[in-house]
Design a protein with these regions (language model features):
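Acidic, glycine/proline-rich low-complexity segments that act as flexible tails and inter-domain linkers
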Residues: 1-49, 69-72, 77, 101-118
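Amphipathic alpha-helical core segments of compact helical bundles
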Residues: 37, 59, 91-98
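Short, structured motif recognition centered on aromatic/hydrophobic residues
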Residues: 51-59, 89
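Short helix-coil transition sites and intra-membrane helix breaks within transmembrane domains
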Residues: 62-66, 98-101
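Mid-chain, well-packed structural core segment of small domains
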Residues: 64-87
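C-terminal structural segments of small proteins and small subunits
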Residues: 87, 94-107
Length: 118
């Protein structure tokens, strides 16, 4: 049986991502559910879309292709992002993070768009 914090975090995780939290989590996942999703993810003030846009901005500035694809895909799947967001976000990123990093964001968004066409 998982802690109440884990259960609250897992419930929030499942609102944010199109998959279920593990019933038998390793230590890293347990900590993520209990802290990131339970403590921070359930705070009032920012919507799931707001949080996703912040994450996208941060990981775009880092050039983190894997998390960009994860967040773009989850945003589409969970209804937080539209297909036009996949075009506009990399364009906007180009002005704040620079063109080379916006190319990484655009490539990740394009990969997710390709999946929508199939």
């Amino acid at each position: 049986m998982q802690s109440e914090r884990y259960q609250a975090g897992a419930a929030k995780f499942e609102e944010v991502y199109p998959r279920q939290a593990s019933e038998d989590p390793d230590e890293f996942e347990r900590m993520a559910m209990e802290n990131l999703f339970s403590e921070y993810g359930t705070r009032q003030g920012l919507s799931t879309r707001d949080r996703r846009l912040l994450i996208l901005g941060i990981v775009a500035a880092q050039g983190n292709d894997a998390i960009l694809k994860l967040q773009f895909g989850a945003g589409i799947a969970m209804g937080d992002l539209s297909e036009s967001d996949l075009t506009e976000i990399p364009i906007f990123v180009s002005q704040y993070a620079g063109f080379p990093l916006s190319v990484v964001a655009n490539a990740a968004a394009s990969k997710v768009k390709e999946g929508l066409s199939n």
